[in-house]
């Protein structure tokens, strides 16, 4: 199910990222900040359980913690750019990695790395990638995680298009929550999002 997070701060920071005059440091800073804002909104939907602690004046207190492990799984390499912002609010979360490279002719992804923490199969898994373009990388990543037995998976992206959303929903129906900061207009002939952000990986790391 698609959820576009409509928040003024997200819109302003996303404008900074879209600006071609923004260098990699500005791009990266705004990406991290949007990640924190997104995870704050996303986790409204998730359950907590009670946790007993002892306060600094030696009193018992019944507080809260998430009822399941939280795991962020960035799709390399661009997904790494969002991780610091996500972990800022949930430092106890674990992080897995899925490496995908895109064939520039067929636009199909190929997996080259996969490592996920040892956590219960019902953990909250968030696949992270700034861009949801064709959706092929997201579909392959989610399929791989499901093959490993994980069934509580969500997709967190900054910018997406209908084609990518439809591709994910074609494979998984509404079982997957898709969280976007913005739903953009279309893909161009090179399968880049318009108006988009450009190549997110290059803009995060200052490469070309």
From Swiss-Prot:
<keyword id="KW-0808">Transferase</keyword>
<protein>
    <recommendedName>
        <fullName>Uracil phosphoribosyltransferase</fullName>
        <ecNumber>2.4.2.9</ecNumber>
    </recommendedName>
</protein>
<feature type="binding site">
    <location>
        <begin position="198"/>
        <end position="200"/>
    </location>
    <ligand>
        <name>uracil</name>
    </ligand>
</feature>
<feature type="binding site">
    <location>
        <position position="77"/>
    </location>
    <ligand>
        <name>5-phospho-alpha-D-ribose 1-diphosphate</name>
    </ligand>
</feature>
<keyword id="KW-0547">Nucleotide-binding</keyword>
<comment type="pathway">
    <text>Pyrimidine metabolism; UMP biosynthesis via salvage pathway; UMP from uracil: step 1/1.</text>
</comment>
<comment type="similarity">
    <text>Belongs to the UPRTase family.</text>
</comment>
<dbReference type="GO" id="GO:0044206">
    <property type="term" value="P:UMP salvage"/>
</dbReference>
<feature type="binding site">
    <location>
        <begin position="129"/>
        <end position="137"/>
    </location>
    <ligand>
        <name>5-phospho-alpha-D-ribose 1-diphosphate</name>
    </ligand>
</feature>
<dbReference type="GO" id="GO:0005525">
    <property type="term" value="F:GTP binding"/>
</dbReference>
<dbReference type="InterPro" id="IPR029057">
    <property type="entry name" value="PRTase-like"/>
</dbReference>
<dbReference type="InterPro" id="IPR050054">
    <property type="entry name" value="UPRTase/APRTase"/>
</dbReference>
<dbReference type="InterPro" id="IPR034332">
    <property type="entry name" value="Upp_B"/>
</dbReference>
<feature type="binding site">
    <location>
        <position position="193"/>
    </location>
    <ligand>
        <name>uracil</name>
    </ligand>
</feature>
<dbReference type="GO" id="GO:0000287">
    <property type="term" value="F:magnesium ion binding"/>
</dbReference>
<feature type="binding site">
    <location>
        <position position="199"/>
    </location>
    <ligand>
        <name>5-phospho-alpha-D-ribose 1-diphosphate</name>
    </ligand>
</feature>
<keyword id="KW-0328">Glycosyltransferase</keyword>
<keyword id="KW-0021">Allosteric enzyme</keyword>
<dbReference type="InterPro" id="IPR000836">
    <property type="entry name" value="PRibTrfase_dom"/>
</dbReference>
<comment type="function">
    <text>Catalyzes the conversion of uracil and 5-phospho-alpha-D-ribose 1-diphosphate (PRPP) to UMP and diphosphate.</text>
</comment>
<keyword id="KW-0460">Magnesium</keyword>
<dbReference type="GO" id="GO:0006223">
    <property type="term" value="P:uracil salvage"/>
</dbReference>
<keyword id="KW-0342">GTP-binding</keyword>
<dbReference type="InterPro" id="IPR005765">
    <property type="entry name" value="Ura_phspho_trans"/>
</dbReference>
<dbReference type="Pfam" id="PF14681">
    <property type="entry name" value="UPRTase"/>
</dbReference>
<dbReference type="GO" id="GO:0004845">
    <property type="term" value="F:uracil phosphoribosyltransferase activity"/>
</dbReference>
<feature type="binding site">
    <location>
        <position position="102"/>
    </location>
    <ligand>
        <name>5-phospho-alpha-D-ribose 1-diphosphate</name>
    </ligand>
</feature>
